[in-house]
């Protein structure tokens, strides 16, 4: 067992090593024009609400009861983050230590359920014409937000020069919740059959990793924007990866 003083020295040495690694693999991070912690929180909330909305709408479309809709919303919103934390060795996952994201997910699901319950005509064929467009937008926003959050989480705990890990964690954080949602709805995961999806996450994660040593806030914003733009363009113009018909 290490004494408190030895623990303090060890943590200080690790922090110094971490800063040296950041200087070695990039430049010193410039002073952010935005409070990074606040930016991360805002992006997490945006992603949580967007993914919770997409999960809830799938549940409503599948005629699930209120509990089913809530479960779909929560698992879509936090599923990717749980997988990320397990990969990074964060135990227990942040979802269980800070339940605010589950609370936002439940609130989002309940609001959508009540709206659709009262306005049942919103589920008719004319309203459903817009369903796919709304789903694409919500999914793109959630995908972009959680992709950069995944990269930032791994970066902050010291995996600065593990580029493949940063990419993997960014993508799995972005697509994990959607995969869980689709499997719970007994659908082939969106990532495997629809227009370019994981590739959009991969591109945004790459931009975020490339710019992270220079300016963390800007790298996260630009990375998320890249994901959203690519995903929406891919859905609009039907960009697909090759497959056997």
Per-region residue spans from a language model:
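Helix-coil boundary and interhelical linker segments in multi-pass alpha-helical membrane proteins
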Residues: 34-39, 86-96, 151-165, 210-218
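Interhelical loops and loop-helix junctions of multi-pass membrane transporters/channels
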Residues: 90-100, 117-142, 151-163
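N-terminal topogenic module of multi-pass integral membrane proteins
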Residues: 33-91
């Amino acid at each position: 067992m290490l004494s408190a003083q030895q623990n303090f020295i060890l943590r200080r040495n690790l922090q110094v090593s971490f800063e040296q690694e950041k200087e070695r693999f990039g430049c010193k991070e410039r002073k952010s024009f935005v409070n990074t912690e606040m930016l991360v929180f805002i992006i997490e909330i945006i992603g949580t609400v967007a993914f919770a909305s997409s999960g809830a709408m799938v549940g409503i479309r599948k005629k699930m009861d209120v509990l089913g809709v809530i479960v779909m919303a929560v698992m879509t919103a936090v599923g990717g983050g749980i997988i990320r934390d397990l990969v990074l060795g964060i135990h227990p996952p942040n979802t269980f230590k800070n339940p605010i994201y589950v609370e936002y997910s439940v609130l989002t699901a309940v609001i959508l359920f009540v709206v659709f319950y009262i306005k049942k005509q919103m589920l008719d064929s004319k309203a459903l014409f817009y369903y796919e467009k709304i789903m694409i937008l919500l999914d793109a926003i959630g995908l972009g937000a959680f992709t950069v959050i995944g990269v930032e989480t791994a970066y902050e705990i010291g995996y600065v020069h593990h580029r493949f890990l940063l990419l993997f964690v960014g993508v799995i954080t972005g697509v994990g919740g959607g995969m869980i949602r689709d499997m719970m709805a007994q659908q082939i995961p969106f990532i495997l059959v629809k227009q370019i999806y994981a590739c959009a996450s991969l591109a945004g994660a790459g931009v975020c990793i490339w710019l992270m040593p220079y300016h963390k806030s800007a790298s996260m914003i630009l990375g998320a924007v890249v994901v959203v733009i690519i995903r929406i363009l891919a859905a609009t113009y039907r960009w697909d990866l090759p497959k056997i018909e």
